[in-house]
């Protein structure tokens, strides 16, 4: 049977000079679906899990550090002055990084033409971008404590250093999720002991890892493991506690802090090292599995907390929304931080 010819093609744009003339549906109405597909929310994971202090003015904040002393028996006739040893003092200083900003400009004419709201989503995205920058900076500082060269790796001699724990097998040998999960759990067993040997409190210990490592731990703790129900929630796929550590899943584990450009790493502060072995680097993007710490290991100093500002830009006939904060981030206690890394191949 011959094909029908001459029928109307109401959806085809047959205007003169149209480039996409082959699209037979071009003129049909595009009905608003009722939902704007916004980016999934990004959540800060470090804000409530490390030390945060606010200052009203100044460029930095001082954190005094005190050492330890020891007791000694005093025999009759001996002088305390002959036995006394001074308690050493030092300090850690966290400097404000500067004013971190994110903004968007909404033109009146485009806002009038648009048929769905964007302001609330734009505002959320601005706030999230600053929160992610703070997260990245804190996580990079944990890695930084692990990478300090030996002559600076303790606040005061005897207080302890950061702990870097290698897996027993290299990365290539740990492609199986269950095997990797068991390696991480074994490493956290060593991490627990290392922190306790440094007299780090048992409460407020956290292990940050990427989704692959988090899933590996889940796989190792699933129903074939003893007491799995006390450690994980199988329905939600979440981990409650492993070896005294709150396990936190972080997609942006190695992102680092913000820089001077909105894209790329130009002028980036709080850089997460890229490669192990460069200088004194023991923990880097190419070998890290996870970072562990006590909440006192890293600090944030706030000069200006996260705030939103709305301004009228009459010369552009537009509204501007600005998110901003002035904070600084830094390592405080090397003895309360550490990392789990893959064995060197």
Curated annotation (Swiss-Prot):
Its main location: virion. One of its GO terms (biological process) is viral translational frameshifting. GO terms for cellular component: viral capsid. InterPro entries: Capsid_Gp10A/Gp10B-like_dom, Capsid_Gp10A/Gp10B_dom. GO terms for molecular function: identical protein binding. Transmembrane segments: none annotated. The keyword Nucleotide-binding does not apply. Pfam families: Gp10A-like. Residues 11-25, 152-156 are annotated as: Intercapsomeric interactions. It is found in: Virion. Assembles with the minor capsid protein to form an icosahedral capsid with a T=7 symmetry, about 60 nm in diameter, and consisting of 415 capsid proteins. The major and minor capsid proteins are incorporated into the capsid in about a 90/10 ratio respectively. Once the capsid is formed, encapsidates one single copy of the viral genome. The N-terminus interacts with an internal region of the major capsid protein subunit in an adjacent capsomere (intercapsomeric interactions) to stabilize the capsid. This is Major capsid protein.
């Amino acid at each position: 049977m011959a094909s029908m010819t001459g029928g109307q093609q109401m959806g085809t744009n047959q205007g003169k000079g149209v480039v996409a003339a082959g699209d037979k549906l071009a003129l049909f109405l595009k009905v608003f679906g009722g939902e704007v597909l916004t980016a999934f929310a990004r959540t800060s994971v470090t804000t409530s899990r490390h030390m945060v202090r606010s200052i009203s003015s100044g460029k930095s904040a001082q954190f005094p550090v005190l050492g330890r002393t020891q007791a000694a028996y005093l025999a009759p006739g001996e002088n305390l002055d002959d036995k006394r040893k001074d308690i050493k003092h030092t300090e850690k200083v966290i400097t404000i990084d500067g004013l971190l900003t994110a903004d968007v400009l909404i033109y009146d004419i485009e806002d009038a033409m648009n048929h769905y709201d964007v302001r609330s989503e734009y505002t959320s995205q601005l706030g999230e971008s600053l929160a992610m920058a703070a997260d990245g900076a804190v996580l990079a500082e944990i890695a930084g404590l692990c990478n300090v060269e030996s002559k600076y790796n303790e606040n005061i001699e005897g207080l302890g250093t950061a702990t870097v724990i290698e897996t027993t097998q290299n990365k290539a040998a740990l492609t199986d999720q269950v095997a990797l999960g068991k390696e991480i759990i074994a490493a956290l067993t060593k991490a627990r002991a290392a922190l306790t040997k440094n007299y780090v409190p048992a409460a407020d210990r956290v292990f940050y890892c990427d989704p692959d490592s988090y899933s590996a731990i889940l796989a190792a703790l699933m129903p074939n493991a003893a007491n799995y129900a006390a450690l994980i929630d199988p329905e939600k796929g979440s981990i409650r506690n492993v070896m005294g550590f709150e396990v936190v899943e972080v997609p942006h584990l190695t992102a680092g802090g913000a820089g001077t450009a909105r894209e790329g790493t130009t002028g980036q502060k709080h850089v997460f090292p890229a490669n192990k072995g460069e200088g004194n680097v023991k923990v880097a993007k190419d070998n890290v599995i996870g970072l562990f710490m006590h909440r006192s290991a890293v600090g944030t100093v706030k000069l200006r907390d996260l705030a939103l500002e709305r301004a009228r830009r009459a010369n552009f006939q537009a509204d501007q929304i600005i998110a901003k904060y002035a904070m600084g981030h830094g390592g405080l206690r090397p003895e309360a931080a550490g990392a789990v890394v893959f064995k060197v191949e």
